[in-house]
């Protein structure tokens, strides 16, 4: 090569063919470098997308080691919670029945303390649910010793008066046939049904007559016969009666009822002014065909005994 050419091209052709020597590294590094260079020479493989399955949720068994956190499952849309219905404002029928049994027992204890001694009368008073015969708004007062309104200017008698009148009518006997004048709501007839074989009851106010039927129906009392009619006339077709109980006050006891009383029978009725003043619970016993004996007992207050029907 001429000097002028050497100046223009300082490197000879031999110098270009000869590759520069690289510094040698460790064996592992040399192998990695070779592998890397080979991988770089190959075209990259096209990867297909793979669907990733959600990891199954595992529940750790009691006492086992804590599991590794798993991939959260696919979220599920939550349904809006439906509001629960409001609890009823009154106690269920079953619970109230248990409560009424307890208060009935306490009512019977008061009756016994007040002088009612006949065990059959006390059992009958305990057996009949008085709260079923009053308006729902008065149910909490059903076992208090008080008269309660039942509509149409009528009342349900106090438990103490009901027990007293039935005990007087029984006089320790087993009653076969009883007549009640003034059915009202049906409570006293229900009590009588526990101490007599057959109970006949008359009501002159049609709505009360219908109400008594409804009140007695759930109790399925087989020995009560209700009649719509004039109580002062009685029920001659079913006479004579071992006992007659009148649940309204008249100035006297109607003669028709005295005639329907069996010999040896007993009639119990309030007698006195219809205003309620000076009413006295009266016992009438039929001692012979044309003879009756009268006893005046306790001061009471009843609605008036009226004739006719409405």
Swiss-Prot record:
Keyword Iron: no
Enzyme Commission code: 2.1.1.77
Subcellular location: Cytoplasm
Protein keywords: Cytoplasm, Methyltransferase, S-adenosyl-L-methionine, Transferase
Region of interest (Disordered), residue spans: 1-42, 64-90
Bias-annotated ranges (Basic and acidic residues): 14-32
Any one GO MF annotation of this record: protein-L-isoaspartate (D-aspartate) O-methyltransferase activity
Keyword flag Cytoplasm: yes
InterPro entries on file: PCMT, SAM-dependent_MTases_sf
Biological processes per GO annotation: methylation; protein modification process; protein repair
Family: Belongs to the methyltransferase superfamily. L-isoaspartyl/D-aspartyl protein methyltransferase family.
Purpose: Catalyzes the methyl esterification of L-isoaspartyl residues in peptides and proteins that result from spontaneous decomposition of normal L-aspartyl and L-asparaginyl residues. It plays a role in the repair and/or degradation of damaged proteins.
UniProt-listed NCBIfam families: pimt (TIGR00080), PRK00312.1 (NF001453)
Record protein name field: Protein-L-isoaspartate O-methyltransferase
Organism: Burkholderia lata (strain ATCC 17760 / DSM 23089 / LMG 22485 / NCIMB 9086 / R18194 / 383)
Upper classification of the organism: Bacteria, Pseudomonadati, Pseudomonadota, Betaproteobacteria, Burkholderiales
């Amino acid at each position: 090569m001429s000097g002028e050419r050497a100046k223009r091209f300082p490197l000879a052709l031999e110098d270009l063919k000869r590759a520069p020597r690289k510094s040698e590294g460790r064996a592992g590094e040399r192998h990695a470098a070779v592998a890397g260079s080979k991988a770089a020479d190959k075209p990259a493989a096209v990867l297909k997308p793979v669907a990733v399955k959600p990891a199954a949720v595992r529940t750790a068994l009691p006492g086992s080691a804590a599991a590794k956190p798993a991939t959260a499952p696919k979220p599920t849309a939550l349904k809006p919670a439906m509001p629960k219905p409001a609890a009823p404002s009154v106690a269920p029928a079953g619970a109230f029945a248990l409560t009424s049994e307890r208060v009935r027992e306490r009512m019977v204890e008061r009756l016994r303390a007040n002088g009612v001694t006949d065990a059959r009368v006390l059992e009958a008073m305990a057996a009949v649910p008085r709260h079923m015969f009053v308006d729902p708004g008065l149910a909490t007062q059903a076992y208090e010793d008080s008269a309660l309104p039942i509509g149409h200017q009528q009342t349900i008698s106090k438990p103490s008066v009901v027990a007293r009148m039935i005990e007087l009518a029984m006089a320790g006997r087993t009653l076969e046939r009883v007549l009640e004048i003034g059915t009202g709501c049906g409570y006293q007839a229900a009590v009588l049904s526990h101490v007599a074989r057959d109970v006949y009851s008359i009501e002159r106010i049609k709505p009360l007559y219908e109400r008594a039927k409804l009140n007695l129906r759930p109790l399925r009392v087989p020995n009560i016969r209700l009649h719509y009619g004039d109580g002062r006339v009685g029920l001659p077709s079913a006479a004579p009666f071992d006992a007659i109980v009148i649940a309204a006050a008249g100035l006297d006891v109607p003669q028709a009822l005295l005639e329907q009383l069996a010999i040896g029978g007993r009639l119990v009725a309030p007698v006195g002014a219809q205003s309620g003043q000076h009413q006295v619970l009266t016992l009438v016993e039929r001692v012979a065909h044309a003879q009756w004996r009268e006893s005046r007992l306790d001061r009471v207050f009843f609605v008036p005994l009226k004739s006719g029907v409405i």
